[in-house]
Amino acid sequence: MLGGLGKLAAEGLAHRTEKATEGAVHAVEEVVSEVVGHAKEVGEKAINDALKKAQESGDRVVKEVTEKVTHTITDAVTHAAEGLGRLGQ
């Protein structure tokens, strides 16, 4: 009879241990999922910020180059017109 009680106690302990382990695994899965989700959000934000900065930088460079080219062409045309004007005098 005592052997049967010991076996029953061992089975109960094994069952409780299994349930506790399942609970711990579930808790760890939730934490890992939350951490991965947070890391994904942070990574996406970092990528978006980097792309935005690159776009702004590219826009600024395009604007500067456009202004420089426009200024250079305007100067060249003005210079040519002045030269032609002197030839016509």
UniProtKB/Swiss-Prot annotation:
Domain of life: Eukaryota
InterPro entries associated with the record: FAM25 (IPR023243)
Coiled-coil regions listed: none
Pfam families linked to this entry: FAM25
Stated family: Belongs to the FAM25 family.
Protein name: Protein FAM25A
The organism of origin for this protein: Mus musculus
Phylogenetic placement of the source organism: Eukaryota, Metazoa, Chordata, Craniata, Vertebrata
Gene that specifies this protein: Fam25a
